[in-house]
Amino acid sequence: MSKTLYQKIYDSHVVYEDKNSTSILYIDLHLLHEVTSPQAFDSLRNKQRTVRQSKKTFATMDHNVSTKIQNISASGSMAQKQMEQLIQNCQEFNIPLYDINNPHQGIVHVIAPEKGMTLPGMTIVCGDSHTSTHGAFGALAFGIGTSEVEHVLATQTLKQKRFKNMKIEIIGKIPRFVTAKDIILFIIGKLGSSSGTGHVIEFCGDVIRNMSMEERMTICNMAIEMGAKSGLIAPDEITYSYLKNKIYSPSGLFWQKSLDYWKLLKSDHNAHYDKCFTVNISNLAPQITWGTNLDQVISIDEKIPDFNDVNSTIKKDSAKSACEYMGLKSNTYLTNISIDKVFIGSCTNARIEDLRSAAGILKNKKIAKHVQAIVVPGSGSVKRQAEREGLDKIFIDSGFEWRLPGCSMCLGMNKDRLNFGERCASXSNRNFEGRQGRGGRTH
């Protein structure tokens, strides 16, 4: 029987499956951070259980950390308590932790790939919705809730149902100044923010094959924004080259054995997909969201849509509500709108290639005096690499603040946030109401 990549990985990890296709899946890698794990550890203690496989579990601090000061007390008492609990829990259960004093600390979805923890064919979970990022390596990766975090800690397995298969083939030649972020935003705008609900999306096509691993991670990172369980890209030579000689990657004979297995990780030619789409990006322009959902997106040279042209009452009401919240009007250009802040960072766009691209645009330029702009590297390793290349100086000379690694302004869980009514051009993955701070407006 022909299988998709998703089906191959899923089937190879089934420990038990009942007649209703509900499975117990073995989990190869469990990633933790300070926000969604404390209750799970407390429940373990209450039930007198331990961590089943601490060597297949990894933790870091990222959501709450200060990007100004290397101190866990700098983000407030609640954040400090969560980080202290993570330290205690990792020590008690012998789980590796990259805390703020570790030179490699950073965003969990940046660290795991760059260190070679994320490998093709794995099942990977984390108490974070953007775990789909790791699907760029041909791994089945998805976010889980706190009760599921506890279950994986205790059993190294997870109860799951089978999802449908969706294929999105991306073709054409990428225009100048168009990035992977533009491509996935365009796809979300075209297909809708709920188009992937109940599915695992496999991205393929010549455009994907010519992308770097960092670009592929951006694509898969935002599969969740289509409502999908996860995103997947079959591994290839670009994947293998990226992984070779990473800290946690296989080496020696194990490297060759792993490579032999990874080369089998692709969908069969006549595998069945429940939905298939082909997207041509040859004429694509840079994309920007105007509303409070990811499918409320336009090209930078387009006007905000006329509500009278929206054929759905629900979508029309949503568009009106979004414009009211964002302080915008239909039939206007976003290029005429003043912004207050700029944020370059997050698990979507805080890797070295992202920083190189941004620095290339900013070189020998100055930002407007009224704008506060910050750039937050995705990890300590990314930060040091950028500094070796002199990118930090370009950012600082242009007027940006060069910060410490962390999730930062992607979400309002630390001191980096928007004030009420402030407008931000952000490289992060969500533009929801209040995402970057109460009353904040995110593009």
Curated annotation (Swiss-Prot):
<protein>
    <recommendedName>
        <fullName>3-isopropylmalate dehydratase large subunit</fullName>
        <ecNumber>4.2.1.33</ecNumber>
    </recommendedName>
</protein>
<dbReference type="GO" id="GO:0051539">
    <property type="term" value="F:4 iron, 4 sulfur cluster binding"/>
</dbReference>
<dbReference type="InterPro" id="IPR004430">
    <property type="entry name" value="3-IsopropMal_deHydase_lsu"/>
</dbReference>
<keyword id="KW-0004">4Fe-4S</keyword>
<dbReference type="GO" id="GO:0046872">
    <property type="term" value="F:metal ion binding"/>
</dbReference>
<comment type="pathway">
    <text>Amino-acid biosynthesis; L-leucine biosynthesis; L-leucine from 3-methyl-2-oxobutanoate: step 2/4.</text>
</comment>
<keyword id="KW-0479">Metal-binding</keyword>
<feature type="binding site">
    <location>
        <position position="347"/>
    </location>
    <ligand>
        <name>[4Fe-4S] cluster</name>
    </ligand>
</feature>
<dbReference type="InterPro" id="IPR001030">
    <property type="entry name" value="Acoase/IPM_deHydtase_lsu_aba"/>
</dbReference>
<dbReference type="InterPro" id="IPR015931">
    <property type="entry name" value="Acnase/IPM_dHydase_lsu_aba_1/3"/>
</dbReference>
<keyword id="KW-0028">Amino-acid biosynthesis</keyword>
<comment type="function">
    <text>Catalyzes the isomerization between 2-isopropylmalate and 3-isopropylmalate, via the formation of 2-isopropylmaleate.</text>
</comment>
<dbReference type="Pfam" id="PF00330">
    <property type="entry name" value="Aconitase"/>
</dbReference>
<feature type="binding site">
    <location>
        <position position="410"/>
    </location>
    <ligand>
        <name>[4Fe-4S] cluster</name>
    </ligand>
</feature>
<keyword id="KW-0411">Iron-sulfur</keyword>
<dbReference type="InterPro" id="IPR033941">
    <property type="entry name" value="IPMI_cat"/>
</dbReference>
<comment type="subunit">
    <text>Heterodimer of LeuC and LeuD.</text>
</comment>
<keyword id="KW-0614">Plasmid</keyword>
<keyword id="KW-0432">Leucine biosynthesis</keyword>
<feature type="binding site">
    <location>
        <position position="407"/>
    </location>
    <ligand>
        <name>[4Fe-4S] cluster</name>
    </ligand>
</feature>
<dbReference type="InterPro" id="IPR036008">
    <property type="entry name" value="Aconitase_4Fe-4S_dom"/>
</dbReference>
<dbReference type="GO" id="GO:0003861">
    <property type="term" value="F:3-isopropylmalate dehydratase activity"/>
</dbReference>
<keyword id="KW-0408">Iron</keyword>
<keyword id="KW-0100">Branched-chain amino acid biosynthesis</keyword>
<comment type="similarity">
    <text>Belongs to the aconitase/IPM isomerase family. LeuC type 1 subfamily.</text>
</comment>
<dbReference type="GO" id="GO:0009098">
    <property type="term" value="P:L-leucine biosynthetic process"/>
</dbReference>
<keyword id="KW-0456">Lyase</keyword>
<dbReference type="InterPro" id="IPR050067">
    <property type="entry name" value="IPM_dehydratase_rel_enz"/>
</dbReference>
<dbReference type="InterPro" id="IPR018136">
    <property type="entry name" value="Aconitase_4Fe-4S_BS"/>
</dbReference>
